[in-house]
Each structure stands twice: as C-alpha cells, then as structure tokens.
Amino acid sequence: MNKALFVYITLAGLALGVFAIWPELDLAGARYFYHAGGFFGRNDFERFGRDFFRVTPFVVLVAYAALWLAKRLGAKPRWAPSGRAMIFLIATMVIGPGLIVNLGFKDHWHRPRPIQTQDFNGPNPFVPWYDNNGGCRKNCSFVSGEASTGFWMVAPASVLPPPWRAPAMVAAFAFGFGASLLRLAFGGHYLSDVLLGGLITLIVVEIVRRVIWPKGGRENVKGYDFDRLRKKTPLT
C-alpha cells in the first residue's frame, strides 16, 4: 500500500468514527451556514458557482480526450495523455463518482440532506451517517456527489508532466475543497457527507493507479516515464 492510499483510508476511518461518536458535529457545521431561515444558494451568482464545480471535471475529461485523439490523428500538441492515462481517468470517474457514490450510496442510503431536516425547517428528522432509515428516498445526502467529482480532479492533475503536476495537484485539491464548501453552504450535505465523498474518490484514484501503473510509473505519449524524466531516459 502506498503512502497516499494509507493516508486516505486512515482519514476515512477517522471521519467515520468521529461522526459516529459525535453526530452533532454535522448539525453544528450545517448551522454555520443557516441564516434567516435558509441556506445560501438562492441567487444567480451562487447557483453559477454550483454549476461551475459540477461541470468543470467533465470539461477537463473531454479536453484530455480531445488531446489524446488529436495526437492519434497526427497533430502535435505540446502534451497529450497516453492511452493508459485515459483509461485511468475514465475508470476513476466511472468507478468513484459514478458507481460507488451516485449509483451506490446516494440512491440507497436514505439520509436526508440538511435542507430536508427538521432542524432546518425541513420535514425529516436528522439521522447520523450510519443510519440508513432516514426519510430521503433517492439522491440523498450520504455521500456528496459534488465532493466526489470535485476531488476526482486529482486524477487528471496527477498524469501531467512534472513541471505542471505539482501546481495542478494543489489546484485540484483546492477545487475539491471549494466544491465541498459550496455544498455545505447550500444545505445540500453535511460535513461527513463531503469528507467521505471526497475520500472515496481519492481512494479509488490510488487503487486504480496501482492497477494501471503497478510499478509506480506515469507515462506520456512521447514514451517517457515521468518519474525518470529528469534523467531524460526514454522507455524501451
């Protein structure tokens, strides 16, 4: 197990434990964004922010696919992802945000969203993350799809060449935190929802990475192993 995967699994376990023992932390976090009888997200600018965080990961995936295709058709972009990298990006998006989060948890874990609970003028009583008997029937609070998709941005950042990778990784984590914060502010999710949504995707990213690059290398279409690029040693 690599260090990143160990850290993500450990953080997920800690989050599950902390919010199981002290579920009131979720309510306290939601109350921070609840003012004048409602949450944020009621004006056009705030709704634009939600759409931005929701759409951008898919735009990035399409852009990477376009670069990959352009390279295959004879164009010469400065950089393009390898076929292996495209499999990595598609697989992590489908498995993490797609199958596990949206088709798995959100449609089968019946936790009401903050905006749907009685503590915030909704119809349903609050339930902690581990209680699957809440009043929500579908597209529920646990876990956050937007947080999951937001932290997926770590995947495309991680396959960039070394000069771009570090700042892109910082931007990717900032994007994930921004998407999560917005969902909290809108009353769409509790803190445990966004933490676990993001961590599930990060765990999936690391597992799929180990499957596709079992020796830990990352390739680009020019045939270089990025982990050895400083030595200018082409793969044979």
Feature roles, as predicted:
Residues 2-12, 126-236:
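Membrane-embedded catalytic cores of phosphoryl/pyrophosphoryl-handling enzymes
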Residues 67-108, 169:
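Interfacial segments of alpha-helical transmembrane regions
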Residues 35-43, 64-80, 216-223:
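Membrane interface segments of multi-pass transport proteins and intramembrane proteases
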Residues 1-67, 104-114, 118, 122-125, ...:
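N-terminal transmembrane-helix/juxtamembrane module of multi-pass inner/ER membrane proteins
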Residues 10, 14, 57, 61, ...:
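Hydrophobic, lipid-facing residues on alpha-helical transmembrane segments of integral membrane proteins
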Residues 21-22, 65-78, 158-164, 207-212:
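Structural signal for the C-terminal ends of transmembrane alpha-helices
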Residues 1, 39-40, 78-82, 128, ...:
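Helix-boundary and loop/linker segments of multi-pass membrane transporters
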Residues 15-20, 94-99, 174-184:
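Aromatic-anchored segments of alpha-helical transmembrane domains
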